[in-house]
Amino acid sequence: MSFDELPATGTIRRAPTGTIERTAPIRRVEPIELLRRVPYGRLATSMRALPFLTVARHIVCDGRILLRMHSGFGHHEACDGSVVAYGADNCNDAASGDGGDLWSVQFTGPAEIVHPCPEQERLFGAAPVSVNGEPFAPAYLRVDPHFVTEHTLNF
């Protein structure tokens, strides 16, 4: 079954053959497009058998997620070649009183260290000056989402 032949449903799962299966009703906006609405998310995986969660700046390019994070902690090296989860949400909208529906998306798939082209670096925007008091040194990962989970809170 090709992508074009899939039933109109929403949560996406890439099958082992590389096809994409949908398992929930489709929304007006695909989950990966929701990432364009917020600049930061959280990357989760394990390092030396212990789980960790770290903040990362993201952009979406060609259906993949590019992440920029601080290299000083070595998190990018722990993720390289591993399956990771990357999540983002608009839950701060509730705290700021913007109202509307809230959403959270999580993408799971393999990550690899990459070197973005100049245009991709510009899309990331300004980098932080420091992280925990040390100068920010960027590292970049690309996540190829194989599984997608989306949750919404409707008000």
Predicted feature residues:
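Charged, gly/pro-rich active-site loop segments
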Residues: 2-14, 21-22, 89-155
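Short beta-strand segments
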Residues: 38-70, 86
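Short, surface-exposed beta-strand-loop junctions and turns on beta-sheet-rich folds
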Residues: 73-75
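Short, basic/aromatic recognition patches
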Residues: 16-42
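Short connector loops at helix/strand junctions that flank enzyme active sites
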Residues: 38, 53, 60-62, 79-83, ...
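Conserved short secondary-structure elements within globular domains
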Residues: 83-84, 124
